[in-house]
């Protein structure tokens, strides 16, 4: 089964054929580290971590690069407001980023390059563009000359005339054409700066990714990915810079994830309806957040609401409960071989369907449907009077494998004695208040965690199942 990827560049699904057999070069645009990330910022790391995991599962050696923009207008503004220097703020939020995405199940990239650690290669990249006539200096700034690059607009599928009509030259900019964009910005008084052939300054945003992608992955990469909002102008400008310099295709497959809406309204800082990851993971299990994000195809928008999150949690718990029941039943199973082949054959069908979903542009929504199918099928098997260790182990292994591909964990942390006692007390209060629905819910939840309650004349006793 071959993998097909929807390529933003061609607007169609294409068979994935990497440049080098069994090797994948992948670049994902990382954050500007001036604040905590919100859930919209967190979608690309989760989506493309899952893509990476699946490629690795299929046997590819994935070289995965994701950068940090650690010098930028937003960072300088934050530094001025807080009375701190730019490196201090950047270091703080790089650490916060790692804490957040690690909690969400994302592996570290092969390399996490920072702009400030690669200034020499960025300056050299700009210098080469100037020498080739694709860039020009203007009073200490350096701009890319878009009219010199014939393919400008090919990623966003917009004619250059239309793009130019919507562009403008801002006050203080010294460029020749409204579509030209900054490669190097002359330092203003009091700003952090680096020495360059054009004077003191710092790089523009777009050049950073082109330079670092080239350094760590070469002139041509297999997959370049990021949020939908980056397609234009960021990724369009990356293509222009890189292909103008090398004369080679910059990236062969372009992948972009969709937006996140909050209660059916587009999430934005201007509307004040954004949710920070480090806040939401205090309220909800980070694994649930990831499962929720993957329950929708990565190119589609996601509507984020507490109601939908709770509904997703119910589904996730059903799978985890089936897994827990399988593990619990393993001890009492035998080497029974009757009917083994039938159940194992069904498991193979689920595995095939899961891979077919992932091969179809990494359709995690359909892949998760197969997780539900495995769990439901397992529950049916557990109704058998006699169960086989071989079949039980096959179910357990399959669930663990599929969850791992999606960056999810199945094991539940064992409840502490005091946590159990607190839940029992909450159940007692519910019964006193004749809230029998809550009482039953607590009992059932504890049962799912292998905690058995026994109501006696002396009170409620419990034991681990």
From Swiss-Prot:
Give the catalytic activity. tRNA(Cys) + L-cysteine + ATP = L-cysteinyl-tRNA(Cys) + AMP + diphosphate
According to its UniProt record, where is this protein located? Cytoplasm
Q: Does the keyword Transmembrane helix apply?
A: no
Motif 'KMSKS' region — list its residue ranges: 266-270
One GO biological process term is: cysteinyl-tRNA aminoacylation
Phosphoserine: residues bearing it: 270
- Cite the entry's keywords alphabetically: Aminoacyl-tRNA synthetase, ATP-binding, Cytoplasm, Ligase, Metal-binding, Nucleotide-binding, Phosphoprotein, Protein biosynthesis, Zinc
Family annotation (SMART domains): DALR_2
Name the predominant localization. cytoplasm
Query: Which cofactor names does the annotation list?
Result: Zn(2+)
Q: Which residues bind ATP?
A: 269
**Pfam families on file:** DALR_2, tRNA-synt_1e
Q: How is the cofactor bound?
A: Binds 1 zinc ion per subunit.
This enzyme's EC code(s):
6.1.1.16
Molecular function GO labels: ATP binding; cysteine-tRNA ligase activity; zinc ion binding
Give residues annotated as binding Zn(2+).
Answer: 29, 209, 234, 238
- Motif 'HIGH' region, per the record, lies over 31-41
SUPFAM superfamilies to which the protein is assigned, alphabetical = Anticodon-binding domain of a subclass of class I aminoacyl-tRNA synthetases, Nucleotidylyl transferase
Q: Which HAMAP family match?
A: Cys_tRNA_synth (MF_00041)
Which PANTHER family does this chain map to?
A: CYSTEINE--TRNA LIGASE, CYTOPLASMIC (PTHR10890:SF3), CYSTEINYL-TRNA SYNTHETASE (PTHR10890)
The Swiss-Prot or TrEMBL record describes its family as follows: Belongs to the class-I aminoacyl-tRNA synthetase family.
Q: Summarize the subunit comment.
A: Monomer.
Q: What is the protein's given name?
A: Cysteine--tRNA ligase
Q: Which organism is it from?
A: Bacillus thuringiensis (strain Al Hakam)
